[in-house]
């Protein structure tokens, strides 16, 4: 479950921690517009098996339970399709999960408005060489995103989250509806983004295909 309660995402009410798995499995999921669907709430294992061989899965709220998640990844043989992520320094991540970091895809999340952000990236590059970094920034005038593009070019992929303006310097899904070149195009061409997290996948795909950037 994404939330602490089941109210927003299902036809139930109450806190997740107060319910049994059997009770949660009786609930039906809502779609992104809040409309009820025929789908029940899956367990993580069920969701991973459904995704296996089809898509990658971004577990963005799993950091506190990575050890439990890793057991399920091994059971389902899905470690290669799950992105495990967190905002902690590399020393903390290695101390807590070092026994299996080489067996999973771990992506650091770095808020590059912070002064220490370049050091955080440098430490990760030196010690873990992540396949990608999720970079977040609010300050539209910040020079750091361009610096990050130069530092990571050819070494690690850059991921930006376009769900909200505060995560990508104003270059979000809403802005893209008015001017996709100034939003998605800017992140790709100017800041080196190769992965974009969006709530508007169909719109984004149409844009990317119009530019010849997607099959």
Please place each PLM-identified region on the residue numbering.
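Metal-dependent phosphodiesterase/phospholipase catalytic core, i.e.
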Residues: 2-112, 127-140, 154, 164
């Amino acid at each position: 479950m994404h939330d602490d309660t089941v109210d927003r995402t299902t036809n139930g009410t109450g806190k997740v921690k107060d319910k049994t798995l059997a009770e949660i499995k009786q609930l039906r999921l809502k779609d992104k517009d809040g409309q009820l669907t025929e789908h029940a709430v899956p367990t993580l294992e069920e969701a991973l098996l459904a995704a296996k061989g089809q898509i990658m899965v971004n577990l963005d709220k799993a950091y506190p339970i990575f050890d439990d998640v890793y057991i399920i990844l091994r059971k389902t043989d899905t470690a290669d399709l799950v992105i495990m992520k967190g905002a902690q320094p590399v020393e903390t991540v290695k101390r807590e999960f070092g026994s299996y970091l080489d067996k999973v895809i771990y992506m650091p999340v770095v808020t590059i408005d912070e002064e220490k952000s370049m050091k955080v990236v440098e430490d990760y590059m030196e010690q873990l060489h992540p396949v990608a970094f999720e970079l977040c920034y609010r300050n539209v005038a910040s020079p750091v995103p361009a610096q990050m593009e130069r530092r990571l070019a050819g070494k690690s992929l850059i991921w930006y989250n376009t769900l909200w303006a505060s995560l990508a310097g104003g270059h979000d899904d809403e802005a893209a509806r008015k001017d996709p070149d100034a939003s998605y195009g800017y992140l790709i061409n100017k800041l080196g983004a190769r992965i974009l997290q969006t709530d508007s996948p169909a719109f984004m795909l149409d844009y990317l295909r119009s530019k010849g950037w997607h099959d």
